[in-house]
Amino acid sequence: MRVFRGRRGAVAGSFLAVLAIGSLALTGCTIERSDAQEQSSQQSTEVEAEEAQAPVISVDDGDEDVDPSESVIVKSMGDGLSKVTMTNEEGYEVESELSDDGRSWTTAETLGYNRTYTIKATDKNGETATASFSTATPAATTNVALSPLADSVVGVGQTIGFRFGSPVKDRKAAQDAITVTTSPKVEGGFYWLNNSELRWRPAEYWEPGTEVTVEADIYGKDLGGGVWGETDNATNFTIGDKVEAVADDATKTMSVYKNGELLRTMPVSFGRDTSEWATPNGTYIIGDRNESMIMDSTTFGLGYEEGGYRTPVKYATQMSYSGIYVHAAPWSVGAQGSYNTSHGCINVSTENAQWFQEAVKRGDIVTVKNTIGETLSGYDGLGDWNIPWSEWSKGNADQTSAW
């Protein structure tokens, strides 16, 4: 566009020069005519100099540690690009796209780590530009697993999980590589449970029907400590009906609600009334649902010789990473609704356990109250809502943990 304007300026200058010459011829001042001709000639030379500009490359010759996830762009400063090639050290030519007007060239594939690339660009005016650069060489790379799974329907308490394959030193860089998009828009934020596990949650429970898309574009991102992102990942999910269970030790019952309507109340038996086994109070997020599983007390440090157990159970619905489930306990039906007998789980009858597992989904909420236990840790893995929003919203990307 600048060249086009320059040409217009040259034409206008010549036209004015002709007018000036004609006028000066009438007055007989030939010395003035010579100055005008020199000015016109100077303008033409300037335009030619302006036209003769080499293509501009978005990376500089000799650049190192270039982010391989970023596109490389070549711009014409003249009439358009006639040829652009970009090859790696093995001679492979990178795929590219040329704009419709022929003035902009862009890489069309992701570059690799630890590569050297050379760009050669030629403009239609004959000017050329060349640049060689190298991409970042990570000491290590890591992936990130996302939850919930793509296209799933989850409960109003579902938080978004990001589990990195190795500890992240630069937490802020990791967060900056992630985009959470919701419809409708909601207020939310990130919080780290440890150096490898990051969560995102809204300030309040989701509204049913909310659509959520998550993009973790970590490839090419320096996550600190020599570790870079290996592969991008993404997921999407929808918020389903609001299903919430309230388990109350004062009544030894658990009531289940759907969109505010009571579906069922069932007798339960909580963890024994001791500081060691009492079921923690607080908000739990429903996790895995297992039609059958083996419960082994050694997984949380209780040996068989210390009164531990290895017991097959039916309809076990996960409430915490620390091993708390709602599950069938036919051996404690006599205690259910009357007193507490478990090692922390919520015991119900087989029929109620099956009904409960079919009534809830991942991300639904269970609220436990009035036990003698403490509150489920917000760092448990399914206890995210036990960290107050006033703390969560501040984030903790500037911190690191011991694990």
From Swiss-Prot:
Low complexity: compositionally biased ranges: 37-46
Matching Pfam families: Big_10, YkuD
EC number: 2.3.2.-
Entry's Gene Ontology BP terms: cell wall organization; peptidoglycan-protein cross-linking; regulation of cell shape
Molecular functions per Gene Ontology: acyltransferase activity; peptidoglycan L,D-transpeptidase activity
Mod. after translation: Glycosylated; by Pmt.
Domain of life of the organism encoding this protein: Bacteria
Pathway per the UniProt entry: Cell wall biogenesis; peptidoglycan biosynthesis
Top enzyme class: transferase
PROSITE patterns xrefs: LD_TPASE, PROKAR_LIPOPROTEIN
Record localization: Cell membrane; Secreted
Lipidation (S-diacylglycerol cysteine): C29
One cellular component term from this protein's GO annotations in UniProt: extracellular region
Domain L,D-TPase catalytic: 243-369
UniProt family annotation: Belongs to the YkuD family.
Name this protein carries in UniProt: Putative L,D-transpeptidase LppS
Species whose genome carries this gene: Corynebacterium glutamicum (strain ATCC 13032 / DSM 20300 / JCM 1318 / BCRC 11384 / CCUG 27702 / LMG 3730 / NBRC 12168 / NCIMB 10025 / NRRL B-2784 / 534)
